[in-house]
């Protein structure tokens, strides 16, 4: 494989020391290991080699693989999620969580000043939060299989959309010409996400112009109406008012 290849792979990723699976594409294995989640789309995934879509050690391994090849690799922390830093374990006043109507508990993930961390302990009005990545300092093991390489432009466009939206269907490829592509978006696609999609398409597929067209489909509008109705009903039960002033 080389930089710019759209490679489709299956994988199982484990923490070396414990054998714990932290990521995988195999739905049957996820169910067997009691880690299946309904909100996850299982199956082979497509990455762009050299585009920083995956950790460095995995990207380097893909460079030396071919379609149909299977390989087990070991990735050191410096090529995975980096080393642990003691200074990223901090004490946060418990009152800061109470102000947000949160009850801190060990093991829970929280956002403090827009930084994600995991609560280690709660004691004496202070909460110890670890802001290291959960896999920082850990050596990882991957079982890889290269399923194929996408070469057609439509396939590449769909792969980019799937990567950034998790196969949610929120965005779809619309009209395509030599130098321009239209991306149909749903009702809740943020500007930052559009920028990431457009930048990736321009750099790795070579399309000069990326347009986003808002498409309001009946089922999406109905879902929005239902959420609004549910919110108004809940507010009514709580004795609140849903009046726009």
What are these regions (language model features)?
Residues 1-245:
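FKBP-type peptidyl-prolyl cis-trans isomerases
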């Amino acid at each position: 494989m080389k930089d710019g290849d759209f490679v489709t792979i299956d994988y199982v990723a484990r923490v070396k020391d414990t054998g714990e699976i932290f990521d995988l594409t195999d739905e049957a294995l996820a169910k067997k290991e009691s880690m299946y989640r309904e909100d996850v789309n299982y199956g082979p995934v497509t990455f762009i080699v050299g585009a920083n879509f995956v950790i460095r050690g995995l990207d380097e391994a893909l460079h030396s693989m071919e379609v149909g090849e299977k390989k087990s690799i070991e990735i050191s922390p410096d090529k995975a999620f980096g080393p642990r830093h003691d200074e990223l374990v901090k004490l946060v006043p418990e009152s800061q969580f109470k102000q947000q109507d949160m009850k801190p508990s060990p093991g829970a993930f929280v956002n403090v000043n827009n930084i994600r961390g995991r609560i280690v302990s709660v004691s004496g009005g202070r909460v110890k939060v670890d802001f290291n990545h959960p896999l920082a300092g850990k050596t990882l093991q991957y079982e890889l299989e290269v399923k194929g390489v996408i070469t057609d432009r439509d396939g590449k466009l769909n792969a980019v959309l799937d990567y950034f939206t998790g196969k949610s269907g929120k965005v779809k490829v619309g009209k395509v010409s030599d130098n321009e592509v239209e991306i149909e978006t749903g009702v809740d696609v943020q500007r930052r996400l559009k920028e990431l999609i457009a930048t990736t398409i321009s750099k790795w597929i070579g399309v000069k112009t990326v347009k986003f067209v808002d498409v309001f489909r009946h089922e999406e509008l109905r879902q929005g109406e239902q959420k609004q109705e549910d919110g108004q009903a809940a507010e009514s039960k709580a004795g609140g008012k849903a009046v726009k002033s």
